[in-house]
Amino acid sequence: MRPLARIRYGIAASLAAMLVAGAALAVPIVTKEGVLPFGTELGEDAAALPTELFATELAGGKRSYQQKLGDMLFSSPAIFGGVAKQAGMSCNTCHQQGAGNAALFVPRLSSRHGNFDTTGALFNPKTDNGLFDPVIVPSLRGAKNLAPYGHDGRFASLRDFIRNVVVNEFAGPEPSGEVLDALVAYVQDISFLPNPKMTSDGKLAAAASDAAHRGEAVFNRPFRHDASMSCATCHQPSNAFADGQVHDIGSGGRFKTKTLVNADFNAPYFHDGRFDSYDQVVGYFDKRYDLGLSAGERADLVAYLDAVGDASTPATTDTVQTELDEIAVFVTVLDTAIHDHNAAIVAVAVDTVGGEWRELGEHYPEAKNTSVTAGLKQRGAARVAVREMVLTLRQVDMAAARGDFHAAAEAYADYREQVAPATSALAAAEPFSLFDPSVRRQHFAALARLAELAK
């Protein structure tokens, strides 16, 4: 879930550059503490979320406690430090549902939407290299089989890569072995999305177009000036369309080969996001390697890349139930931590789950929000229910912190009893919430009008 409750919308920022475009809205924000630059966009306002599937469940199994702990930590600001923690950011802020984030923009750190400088001074001054070198936020789908890690492939293991992100990029404290193991287990379980146009061994299926099949031949054809090379040399179809190597393709250094699987949803492209489309990418390689492609061959190659990069259900509509389902996963971690008398994990779980509830409550506009006039009683009841859930969670944390796990278990039992009535209250108010497309449009249209008045 995206932590809207912890990343507060400053009036000046949210009104000065509000854009309304169907379901996709660009909402510049500042935090309550003002720690993020004016005009920051975290892409947390979309009505649909990237679909997230797990290899364990696709194989018919069930996710382990460790994987669920990693999932929860992935959405927790507690593992970061400095500005990121103050702003309520988490791994999930940038890697939404394990995917990328093409809407991300941080002034002075981003050259375009979808990239930012991970070695700039904002999040960790100690690792500031004095260069402006933004990189895209990569999708983590299929990461288990996509070593090495980092855009330049400097990390051989996913564990080292994750530690670097937490400690060096976002100034977090040194994570414990338990935390690192859990994050690795979670990321390794994030699966590629199914693609009916492709077979399991990287070949086109019958569902692919004729143009894509012609493009497949172009993709595998040797370059005219170097018969030892083809597109498939680096983007190996049988190896998730990658080769585990770094190469200098004239883009400013040596960078790892990106997978093409599900890449339709990974734009912008190249390490710095300089290209928006496959057509631009193909044009670059055609010129760089003097491939001599005809207009038809270029179009066919684009069709092939589009087929390889496709997915059957790339996004999932955000609803009350999808949010509650995620909270339920995180709560299982809290359950186990109480049983194990693990006060540290209880504290993180309460903070994270409480944040998820508060974010959920933000979808139900307050009475003073005059852009939403209907369902005032229902919205009020939903917000009260959310507050009660958060308060009960605090009782769990306070009891665990003083070592009274019997009291923590009792408070947790109270929490579980409150879930059903809270769910009913949220469901009753859903037609009057920002989960409803018409209410959402009305709400943000009102903010856009205020932005015009503020000019």
Predicted regions mapped to residue ranges:
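Bacterial N-terminal signal peptides
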Residues: 10-22
